[in-house]
Amino acid sequence: MTDSEYISALKGLIDSAISVGRDWLWNDSDIMDTLTDENGFGLTYDDFVMAGFKEMADEYFN
């Protein structure tokens, strides 16, 4: 396996893990409620956007 093939495979694996993680996080409202609560503790909209979850933040916080 060449370096470029290895890097390509690694990128695919990372993209898949991110996709699964997003689906799992978004579909479990208990987790979302734990990460963000009404008292201002936990993750904010900006935290989600900076982590690459802008679409999720737009839906959850608006």
Enumerate the predicted regions with their spans.
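Acidic, low-complexity, intrinsically disordered interaction modules
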Residues: G12-N62
